[in-house]
Structures are given as C-alpha cells and as structure tokens.
Swiss-Prot record:
It comes from Bacillus subtilis (strain 168). Involved in transcription antitermination. Required for transcription of ribosomal RNA (rRNA) genes. Binds specifically to the boxA antiterminator sequence of the ribosomal RNA (rrn) operons. This is Transcription antitermination protein NusB. HAMAP family: NusB. Belongs to the NusB family. InterPro entries: NusB-like_sf, NusB_fam, NusB_RsmB_TIM44. Keywords: RNA-binding, Transcription, Transcription antitermination, Transcription regulation. CDD domains: Terminator_NusB. GO terms for cellular component: cytosol. GO terms for molecular function: RNA binding. One of its GO terms (biological process) is transcription antitermination.
Length: 131
C-alpha cells in the first residue's frame, strides 16, 4: 500500500471513530475494505489514538476564534493525522506531512479547508522546529 493510500484510509478510520464511536478494529476493517493491512496505516491510526490528547492540545493552541470540537470532523481528523506525523514520525520530513495533509484537505474538505489546515500546520511546524 502506498503511503498516500495509507493516509487516506487512516483518515477514513479516524473520521469514523470520531463521529460514530465505532470500535477501532471495526473502523480499521471498514477503511481497509478487504484490502490487506499495512504497517504504516496501522501506525497512523493507533498513533493518533494513543497521542490524541497531546495532538488536540497542539492543534487547539493554534485555533484562532475556534474550538477543536467546532471545526469540521474531517478537518479535525486531517489535523490530528498530520500533527501525529509531524511530532512522532521522525522518518517523515515535516514538509511531506504538511503537503500530504493539504492534499487530503483538498480531496475531503470544503473550499476553506486547505488554507485552514495549512495555517494550523504551519504554526505547529514552527513550534516543533523551536523545540
């Protein structure tokens, strides 16, 4: 499975978990849709869920006039996924994670999602580079 596909499927699983309280294994199964699982996909889903509180804190810090629970579910899932990669997946360059998140926002978000995701992730990138 290509990494872009793994990210899309991880986004689908995380979105389902967020909006429907579906069990993690069930969301993973549904996102894979009978396709063979992939270690990168598994790392993304489980990593985001394991670090969700820290990721939400990182994201919330950069939401201007917004609260995390008020942004679109898909945008929240994209931000969590990208923030996880940026903060915890050391083998992936931060710019790659940002670009992939922007592509996900273009594909799955509304017209304003791309700029919003880019803005939040740019601020998270600055925080990571300063630490």
């Amino acid at each position: 499975m290509k990494r872009r596909t793994a990210r899309e499927k991880a986004l689908q699983a995380l979105f389902q978990i967020d909006v429907s309280d579906i069990a993690v294994n069930e969301a993973i199964e549904h996102a894979l849709d009978e396709e063979k699982t992939d270690p990168f996909f598994e790392q993304l889903v489980h990593g985001v869920l394991e670090h969700q509180d820290q990721l939400d804190e990182m994201i919330s810090k950069h939401l201007v006039n917004w609260k995390l629970d008020r942004i679109a579910n898909v945008d929240r899932a994209i931000l969590r996924l990208a923030a996880y990669e940026m903060a915890y997946a050391e083998d992936i360059p931060v710019n790659v994670s940002m670009n992939e998140a922007i592509e996900l926002a273009k594909r799955f978000g509304d017209d304003k999602a791309t700029k919003f995701v880019n803005g939040v992730l740019s601020n998270i990138k600055s925080d990571i580079e300063q630490s």
